[in-house]
Every structure is written in structure tokens, then in C-alpha cells.
Amino acid sequence: EKGFGFISPADGSKDVFVHFSAIQSTSFKTLDEGQRVEFTIEQGQK
């Protein structure tokens, strides 16, 4: 809805910011609350 959100790592570490443009999907670029995902942390401009 906002175009961004946060992912909570399974290891309990700090939440990670995610922008919709970073979502790699063959369909809609959305994530649902509670959905399990795999991710790689990369440094952005901020």
C-alpha cells in the first residue's frame, strides 16, 4: 500500500527496510504480513 515496509529476520535481529522495487517476483510486487521470504541485505543511499 505504501510502497515500502519492514522485514523481521528469523534470527530476531533488527528489522530491515524493504522498498517494493527490491521485490523480485514474476507477478505483483507485494508481500503479505507473516509471509516468509528470502532476502539479501544491501546498503542503499540512506
Swiss-Prot record:
Keywords: Activator, Cytoplasm, DNA-binding, Stress response, Transcription, Transcription regulation. Residues 1-46 form the CSD domain. InterPro entries: Cold_shock_CspA (IPR012156), CSD (IPR011129), CSD_CS (IPR019844), CSP_DNA-bd (IPR002059), NA-bd_OB-fold (IPR012340). Gene3D superfamilies: Nucleic acid-binding proteins. Induction: In response to low temperature. It is found in: Cytoplasm. One of its GO terms (cellular component) is cytosol. It comes from the Bacteria. SMART domains: CSP. GO terms for molecular function: DNA binding. Homodimer. PANTHER family: COLD SHOCK DOMAIN PROTEIN 2, COLD SHOCK DOMAIN-CONTAINING PROTEIN 4. This is Major cold-shock protein. The gene is cspA.
